[in-house]
Amino acid sequence: MHIVILDGGSTNPGDVSWAPLRALGSVTVYDSTKPEKIVERAKDAEAVILNRNVISREIMQKLPKLRFIGLLATGYNTVDVKAAGELGITVCNVPLYCVETVAQQAFALLLELCNHTEKISAATRGGDWDKAETMSHSTHPLFELYGKTLGIVGFGHIGQTVAKLGAALGMKILVYSRTKRELPERYQWAELDALFKNADVVSLHCPLTDETRGLVNAERLNLMKPTAFLINTARGAVVDEAALAEALNSGRIAGAGLDVLVHEPPKKDDPLLAAQNCIVTPHIAWASRDARARLIKTVAENLKAFRNGTPQNVVS
């Protein structure tokens, strides 16, 4: 089987192995592929593996040998899955491979906002502590999470894991989700506006849909406490970026930690890149080495199951 990986660079910059896929056939790896090069590079492929490249009906119709599309991701909005099904092409995704690492990044962003570790360390290494006359010296006040309220928007696997981390630190947990289920003791359901009003930290873990696009708008930001933080490891377009930048720069909320933006990479004039008390990381929450190794392993398992006539994780 000839396997083409169109954009393997983000999944594997060289620190993990493609061996699970190489065991299934001949593999050609491209770090990235421009849209106009997809057909040329995949023309002889029976299986195409991709992360962010867009595969339309038109492209699939130009790839007569294509039988399988393996997504190096959980989301599958980059592939026309309806067309794939009609053309007899199986599309498989990888659920749950990065739950823990995304939750870890959400808390890394939150803890940096609370403890200012990098800023305080830089000040200390710059001689600030040397000049002090006290044993304990800090250039930034610390924010304690114990007893505070964590609002979780979206209660899938990642949202549940973030809630557990918050509960372990003694936080009260408010949950908003379209689907209700039994909650652990000390968790409470909340309507969306009530959650924004009462939470000390709002953490977003919902998918991007027509319903959630722009969900965090000026009106909801105005509901938040001036001491509250917003964390987004979901999708950039869930947040109105201009409204969030205004809320940060005016002191309407205390800070934001973002791993996702509307445009990735961002435009140079993205207002959040210069916003006050805003930490931005380049969509890396999913990308721990362990998570990326799991991702490649599961894509290979998906392809092997397809070849054996028992496909798994099918989304087409």
Where are these regions (language model features)?
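N-terminal glycine-/charge-rich "phosphate-binding" loop or analogous flexible N-terminal tail
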Residues: 1-45, 174, 307
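Short beta->alpha connector loops at strand-helix junctions that form conserved
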Residues: 31, 51, 72-73, 89-100, ...
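An anion/phosphate-binding loop that grips the pyrophosphate of nucleotide cofactors and donors
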Residues: 45, 63, 199
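Rossmann-like adenosine-cofactor binding region
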Residues: 54-60, 172-174, 178-271
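Phosphate-binding beta-alpha-beta segment of Rossmann-like dinucleotide-binding domains, i.e.
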Residues: 87, 95-149, 315
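Rossmann-like dinucleotide-binding domain for NAD(H)/NADP(H)
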Residues: 87, 91-92, 227-316
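Glycine-rich Rossmann-fold phosphate-binding loop(s) that bind the pyrophosphate
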Residues: 155-156
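N-terminal Rossmann-fold NAD(P) dinucleotide-binding loop
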Residues: 159-160
